[in-house]
Amino acid sequence: MKKSLFSTKTMVATALGAALFMVLFMFVKVPSPVPETNLQIAYGISAFFAAVYGPVAGFLIAFIGHALSDFLSYGSPWWSWVVASGISALICGLAYFKINTEGKVSTKDLLVFNVFAILGCAIAWVVVAPVLDIVIYGEPVNL
């Protein structure tokens, strides 16, 4: 079957993924040993959907889900982190073009997916989020 970034199936999966991301982001938090920090299961969901349905779906799932979660929890989204969530899922979604998403998933497919996931997280949380915090919110540059 030909892969399509904009099929009806992909759009429905995007809507369901965004809703699932929002609920998990708001209510399912795994405590971490780092103070004031939790592990978010929602990012795994966005990465999975991105790998199966493509980078556009991944970006929209994480972006919309995170924005709605922030809006409902805090009254307004923290846009720099919302964009970073979307970018991390978008980069994970680039694996969509390199892996087999139908049938048996090989060890190579899992390795490729994990490389994209690590790159996506590194770029989003080490570059995009801090830079946008500085640009959008005028946060001080602390090197």
Predicted regions and their residues:
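Loop-helix junctions at membrane interfaces
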Residues: 1-143
